[in-house]
Regions:
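Acidic donor-binding segment of Leloir-type glycosyltransferases
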Residues: 24-58
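Short aromatic/hydrophobic "clamp" motif used to bind/position activated sugar donors
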Residues: 81
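A recurrent flexible, glycine/aromatic-enriched loop bordering the glycosyltransferase active site
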Residues: 129-146, 168, 203-206
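Non-catalytic, C-terminal membrane-associated alpha-helical segments of glycosyltransferases
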Residues: 210-218, 229-287
């Protein structure tokens, strides 16, 4: 397709060895692919670049999704880029649909995204199924079509956010600049795999606790940017009370797993309220 010369695909990986080969294999060979590899897997880099000539892998310290995407965008030389998570089902014929609407909108947009299938309504807001295309507050960060110039104009993703709410913050800032997000219902995707695979049970639990910590940290951080500190404190007060109640409950019932989970949640929220960085990393969590 003629569109392939004007787009790059950016994939961010972290301990994604088991799925990345299968995912990259399905990408048309004429599309440039940039892989930002955050677990510094040199073997993965060598094998991917040897097997797929359209792929370039960059090894980095894990500084989070935002920092990684910003880095990947800097490495692109095309007008547009598609940020994809390797756990998704993607039909690359849909690229022509993205280009059609990008042209129709005269590139005056923040991001374009697909309709996600088999998702929970509460956790993933989407436009009405009957619509062809419509504005939406935020496009899911795992599948975003963007214009590089507009991405840079908006200021990229906030590198202070390690994980979660990166796209929400980005789309919020874009909206204030009258650059809107659009969901295209003709383009569909769904999650078919797991991005991070950790076999060790204890390490897997540590990973889940890390996600809990960063989710609440980022949630308050974004709320503070949007609503201000005092209003955010009021909004989060019921959450703080629920967390403290759960900690007391699981201490009484001696449920160590759930107790640890809510301690991580409380700690993440505490550090975000204090204005501390999203510092927690997997290797810092001890069993």
């Amino acid at each position: 397709m003629k569109y392939y010369n004007d787009i790059s695909i950016i994939i961010i990986t972290y301990k994604s060895d088991q799925i990345i080969y299968k995912f990259v294999k399905k990408i048309p060979k004429k599309i440039k692919v940039i892989v930002v590899e955050n677990s510094k897997n040199l073997v993965l880099k060598k094998n991917l670049e040897k097997k797929f000539k359209n792929v370039k892998v960059y090894l980095r310290n894990n500084e989070g999704v935002s920092s990684s995407l910003n880095y990947g965008v800097k490495k692109t030389k095309t007008k547009y880029f598609l940020h994809l998570s390797p756990d998704l089902q993607v039909d690359y014929n849909d690229i022509k649909v993205f280009f059609y609407y990008a042209k129709k909108l005269r590139d005056n947009f923040c991001a374009l995204g697909p309709r996600f299938l088999k998702t929970k309504k509460r956790g993933h807001i989407q436009i009405d199924k009957k619509l062809t295309i419509a504005k939406i507050d935020s496009i899911h960060g795992s599948y975003m079509f963007m214009n590089k110039q507009k991405f840079n104009k908006i200021g990229g993703w906030d590198k202070k956010i390690f994980l979660y709410f990166e796209e929400t913050d980005f789309c919020y800032r874009a909206k204030k600049m009258n650059l809107f997000c659009y969901q295209i219902n003709k383009i569909k995707t769904q999650t078919i795999d797991t991005t991070v695979k950790i076999e060790n049970k204890k390490l897997r639990q540590n990973w889940l606790n890390l996600l809990i910590w960063h989710f609440i940290w980022s949630k308050f951080y974004f709320s503070k940017k949007k609503n201000g500190f005092l209003i955010s404190l009021i909004i989060f007060l019921p959450i703080i009370i629920r967390i403290l109640f759960r900690i007391i409950l699981y201490k009484i019932t001696s449920d160590k797993t759930k107790l640890t989970k809510f301690k991580f949640r409380l700690n993440g929220l505490y550090n975000s309220i204090k204005g501390n960085k999203s510092f927690l990393r997997l290797n810092q969590i001890k069993n």
